[in-house]
Amino acid sequence: MQIDSFKVEDWMNEYEKYSKYDLGNTTVNTMSLEELFELSGENKENFLNSLCALKQGYGFIKGNPELKKGIAKLYKTVEEGHILTTIGAAGANHLVFYSLVEPSDRVISLIPTYQQLYSIPASFCSDAVVLKLKKENGFLPDLDELKNLITPNTKLICINNPNNPTGALMPLGMLEQIAQIADKAGAYILSDEVYRGLSPDEEKMPSMADIYEKGISVCSMSKVFSLAGLRLGWIACRDEAAIETFVRHREYNMISCSVTDESIASLALKNSDRIIKRNCTAVRECLEVLDKWINSSKHFSYVKPRAGTTAMVYYDFDMPSEILCDRLAKEKGVFLTPGCCFEEENCFRVGFCKSPDVLQQGLDKISEFVQNYLTF
């Protein structure tokens, strides 16, 4: 089976080594276990003693019950039996495609987005199509265009909300309309929600798993909870037939998740409100820095992100995004992701949730480079 190179991952693997100012990664101030204990107020000694005593077997095949209880609290209608743990959100997305999609099915994906959501279906589905999100529409989908892409063989509509790389956020009404479109077609909706809950104003964001019975919401401990090292994600879906299908396919490639990872994640989710509040504060402070820089610049523009930790920044001079980001990395130590990794040009993605000082320094280096480039 042929599949396209994962452009973002290839780029990050190659250019992260140049990073003095990391504006490429999109997690929020990754936490250590020490920081997790400080934030939660949990007794570190008691927890570590229980962790050391934990038998390193396969654990609970469908996920630790305490963890699933914590995950269920992130939704309105999702229960513990509707949840299946996976190895990261990437593992969850892959499992959904592998379990549901037949070669003759139509899969509709929105771009720009996380490449996994369109390259995997394109690799084994003969009828994979994309709907282009446009800057002039605030990177929100044109629902008339979506309706026109629906065919009798449509199996799955893939969305990413909040959107990576643009930071666009679909409101509840739009999500409900997408659910209605899918329902008429008898299709599932895969909603990658790894940034759900991260916004400057701590806005409560709806989940597709709550809106639509055949909605499949994917999330993880990586972005919202700053614990990417756990490599733990999940699927939330109220459609029992889909969950049974996911379990059946999951048994062939992972069996279960790490009992250690699930125990730490359970601790974190007991304190989810505190972690989300911490991270929304970081989003707000860093977005203020980015927005001020954009507004003071002659050469850069963006659609201000509504949620998440990423922004797509456009520039008005003639240089391919790959060359610009290559030079910024090697000459200025600024690590960015070029727009070409998202099928876009004359732009780059900024992962803006760093310390405000590092973010400001990195943005200043970009300005310095552009000023020198345009002078010659």
Predicted regions, residues:
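Structural signature of PLP-dependent enzymes
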Residues: 243-250, 268-291
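Conserved PLP-anchoring active-site segment centered on the Schiff-base-forming lysine
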Residues: 99-121
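Helix C-cap/helix->beta junction micro-motif
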Residues: 124, 184-185, 297, 332, ...
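Conserved glycine-rich beta-strand-loop-beta hairpin in the small C-terminal domain of fold type I
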Residues: 266, 282-291, 302-315
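Active-site phosphate-binding strand-loop segment of PLP-dependent enzymes
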Residues: 135-203
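N-terminal small-domain helix-loop-helix segment of the aminotransferase-like
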Residues: 1-88, 268, 372-376
